[in-house]
Swiss-Prot record:
KW S-adenosyl-L-methionine (keyword) present: no
Example GO BP: RNA processing
Protein known as: Polyribonucleotide nucleotidyltransferase
Matching Pfam families: KH_1, PNPase, RNase_PH, RNase_PH_C, S1
Length: 755
């Protein structure tokens, strides 16, 4: 029934296999990829389009359902919903790797679905997903003539490169680099690095490319065994339209010489309309005209840049646009920055929170918590578009993650800065490289906030104009240069090295020479941008902003953690409610208190210490009247504990009723004279001077008081004998008193823990 074809190799110490003929046989191409115990089903379906479109309708979806990890989805709904960020990012990696390889003019609808069947939590799925997508395309009949592969590269503590590192190895790796390429060139790179120099990054790319070759050979052998032939494809001939456009060359040259984006865009729109209308009247298809105009502009612009040595806005190849930097522009936020580079502008705002504000991520490796979040927003008005603002799409998620990777390596450890950090980048204007403007703005905003980042970070986007063996590398590309060029190579880092990298191609790959020169030119541009940023702010503020929450931390004994939390969280909840603060207690006994002011944080700290302090006989405490019975007053102590006081301990003279002296809600100072069997303290008001808070050492019992048989046990305390009171040291335990002399709890580092 099944005609199964399977090929496999040993790669990176694990078995990589490709199999087809058993599952999803109605798809044009279907491949099951196994790498270790990670298994992915990749399907390719092609739908021929009669309608002419000026883009490639390629849709790539990576789907990771929880059954692949042996789990049931959490939450109320037990069915997967919208794609996670991880699924979106893997889908983008595959899309960006294969999109440039489709033949120009091919516009059939292509759907690629990568279904994660099993995941061993060791081998990340990005690599087998891309390999499976290429293998499925190779056997689908789609005119896709390039065979590529993907690889992960890590770097250990001895600067040794690791091929396809495991999830555990990636946690300690100084490099997380994914690249795709063919036998001769590099197609796509994405990485996060811990300030690695350009040479290390280039060597990692060479290492990865070398280890791609066995996989490329495997895919070719797999496709040859099946023997599927590619469908013939011939693009529609638009040479006659292209020839007709030659007479508009001068108009386009003048338009592209305008340095202001809005003026340039308006002029180009006018020229295009002047071209479109007559050709439509002549019977030409509008979409073919649009495609021809795009090709003509691309060819003309590339010629201008190569021959004249200047760019659209008059800059040299390696020249950076004018940069303006401002910080602290929003008064009530925790930190803000406005970064403007030419006509690209990012308003970046930070907000600080507690551990309770961390993002819980349901990842394929299991639930994890993120204490640093970076959200990138690209509203339509940033490019003068009138369309409605919608939820973030793949592009916004991808750009935000790239900026996150650029900043993440320089963030302080959570033990050093325990706040949860959220950064939001609002793109106000865009003319290319808005993601790198986000990187620069985020670095500035974090320093303005007071986050102790290790070094400032800047980012730059590089472009490429390539004609056969001749090429020109452009620094800080405009939107038009990105649209009409061959490469978008984003590089972010500090003065010491690279923290993030992303390279996308519009051609079928570039050489190591171009990669190396791009990195060198990007470094010069990055250092120039850092110089501009450092002239405004080069170090983080000494303290967080006035509107940011204050934090104080201290340690308690581990055996007191349960008491600090209380039954079902009662104690910690009570302290939070009474102090208007947030309190977090770690397994190591570290208590972190967050409040809107230092004074509130200190009050909450003292309340927490009081709540776990054991009372002693002779202690003087603040109390509050909760309930009054005939002869007993129920009291609440500073730490929320309950206490009792007999009518005979209210005053030093005979009273007919407690209400004649006290009423509910009254507060006063009381002496702890004894404890009931259950631990409830017995208290006395009459033995304490309410003005000074001192203990009446020598006061005698008023003879007018009469003992009763019911009260005899209550007075059977050494403090209640009529012969006088035993002298003993007395400790004041007031939640409002000076605590400088009170005993320390563990290692109290509160003075050094304020931010």
């Amino acid at each position: 029934m099944f005609e199964i074809i399977k090929k496999s190799i040993e790669w990176g110490g694990r078995t990589l296999s490709l199999e087809t003929g058993k599952i999803a046989r109605q798809a044009d191409g279907s491949v099951v990829v196994n790498y270790g115990d990670t298994s992915i089903l990749v399907t390719v379906v092609r739908k021929k389009k009669e309608e002419i479109v000026d883009f490639l309708p390629l849709n790539v979806q990576f789907i990771a359902k929880s059954y692949a990890m042996g789990r049931i989805p959490g939450g109320f709904f037990k069915r997967e919903g919208k794609p996670s960020d991880r699924e979106t990012l893997i889908s983008r990696v595959i899309d960006r790797s294969i999109r440039p390889l489709f033949l120009e003019g091919f516009h059939d609808e292509i759907s690629i679905v990568c279904n994660l069947l099993t995941y061993d939590t060791v081998n990340p799925p990005e690599v087998p997903a891309l390999i499976g997508a290429v293998a499925a395309l190779a056997i689908s009949g789609v005119p896709f003539h390039f065979i590529i592969a993907g690889v992960l590269v890590g770097c250990d503590g001895n600067n040794n490169y690791i091929l396809n590192p495991s999830v555990q190895e990636m946690k300690v790796s100084s490099l997380d680099l994914f690249l795709s390429g063919d036998e001769r060139s590099i197609l796509m790179v994405e990485s996060e690095a811990k300030e690695l120099p350009e040479e290390n990054i280039l060597n990692a790319i060479k290492f990865g490319h070398e280890h791609l070759q066995p996989v490329i050979k495997l895919i070719k052998e797999f496709a040859d065994t099946i023997g599927n032939k590619f469908d013939s494809f011939a693009p529609i001939d638009i040479s006659d339209i292209m020839q007709d456009l030659e007479k508009h060359s001068k108009d386009f040259e003048e338009a592209y010489s305008q340095t202001v984006k809005q003026e340039r865009a308006q002029t180009l729109e006018t020229i295009r309309n002047n071209i479109l209308n007559p050709l439509k009247e002549a019977g030409k298809d509008e979409k073919l005209i649009t495609q021809a105009v795009k090709n003509f502009e691309r060819s003309l612009l590339r010629k201008i840049i190569r021959e004249k040595g200047t760019r659209i806005d008059g800059r040299k190849y390696d020249e950076i646009r004018q940069i303006e930097v401002e910080v602290d522009i929003l008064s009530r936020t925790h930190g803000s920055a406005l970064f403007t580079r030419g006509s690209t502008q990012a308003l970046v705002v930070t907000a600080l929170g507690t551990t309770q504000d961390e993002q819980i991520v349901d990842d394929i490796e299991g639930d994890r918590r993120e204490h640093f979040m970076l959200h990138y927003n690209f509203p339509s008005f940033a490019v003068g578009d009138a369309s409605a603002i919608r939820a973030p799409g793949r592009r916004e998620i991808g750009h935000g993650k790239l900026a996150w990777k650029a900043i993440h390596p320089v963030l302080p450890d959570k033990s050093e800065f325990p706040y949860t950090i959220r950064v939001v980048s609002e793109i106000m204007e865009s003319d290319g490289s808005s993601s790198m403007a986000t990187v620069c703005g985020t670095s500035l905003a974090l320093m303005d906030t007071g986050v102790p980042i290790k070094s400032p970070v800047a980012g730059i986007a590089m472009g490429l104009i390539k004609d056969k063996n001749d090429y020109v590398i452009l620094s800080d590309i405009l939107g038009d240069e990105d649209y009409l060029g061959d490469m978008d190579f984003k590089v972010a880092g500090t003065s010491e090295g690279i923290t993030a990298l992303q390279m996308d191609m519009k051609i079928s790959g570039i050489s190591f020479e171009i990669v190396e020169k791009s990195l060198e030119q990007a470094k010069a541009g990055r250092l120039h941008i850092l110089e501009k940023m450092n002239s405004v702010i080069s170090e983080h503020s000494d303290d967080v902003k006035g509107h940011a929450p204050r934090m104080v931390s201290f340690y308690i004994d581990k055996d007191k953690i349960s008491a600090a939390i209380g039954a079902k969280g009662k104690n910690i909840r009570s302290v939070c409610e009474r102090s208007n603060a947030k309190i977090e207690i770690g397994d190591d006994g570290k208590v972190s208190v967050f409040a809107m002011s230092s004074a509130e944080a200190e009050i909450a700290k003292n309340m927490m210490i009081d709540s776990i302090t054991e009372l002693e006989q002779g202690a003087i405490v603040d109390v509050k009247v909760v309930k009054i019975d005939k002869s007993i007053v129920e009291l609440e102590l500073f730490n929320g504990r309950k206490g009792k006081m007999h009518i005979s301990e209210v005053a030093n003279q005979h009273i007919e009723s407690i209400e004649s002296i006290l009423k509910q809600g009254d507060t006063f100072k009381a002496l702890v004279i004894d404890f009931e069997k259950g631990g409830c303290p017995k208290l006395s008001r009459r033995r304490v001077d309410q003005e000074t808070g001192d203990f009446f050492e020598g006061e005698l019992y008023n003879e007018e008081k009469k003992d009763s048989s019911n009260d005899r046990d209550y007075y059977n305390s050494p403090f209640n004998r009529k012969s006088g009171h035993r002298k003993r040291p007395v400790h004041s335990r007031s939640s409002f008193s000076n605590r400088n002399n009170r005993p320390k709890f563990g290692n109290d580092d509160s003075s050094s823990s304020f931010y």
